[in-house]
Amino acid sequence: MAKITRTNPEGISKPFSNYSHVVTAEGAQKLVFCAGQVGADVDGKVLPPDDFDAQAKMVMANLTKALAAGGAKIADVTKITIFICNPHDVPKARGILPTYFAGAAPASTLCILRGLANPNFLLEIEAIAAV
């Protein structure tokens, strides 16, 4: 099991949301890289394109399953990247971290893009975990 340390160094602004500026993993025997997960169910059906919260819940369920397939769990995540298309969804996107990563805030990047692979996707999240 990796020893994961999360730090917010002095001299850098406080995080704007529930994330850590620096995450180190010592003694990691395995890194798990999860491709971007989206708001689609097991059959590939995209959840309603106007329901960010429903898609976010599905994204996190999919991410949890992907991590488990690699032998990791949410608490092992050291870095996530969140991709969204609508700047108005920034507060909701930032809300994902305290909801799902409480007490284990990973290093995080939030990107606003012109679009994702399917125009009905409202967000996509990729992750790296250390176990």
Where are these regions (language model features)?
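N-terminal presequence-like segments and the immediate start of the first folded domain
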Residues: M1-A61, K65-T78, I84-V131
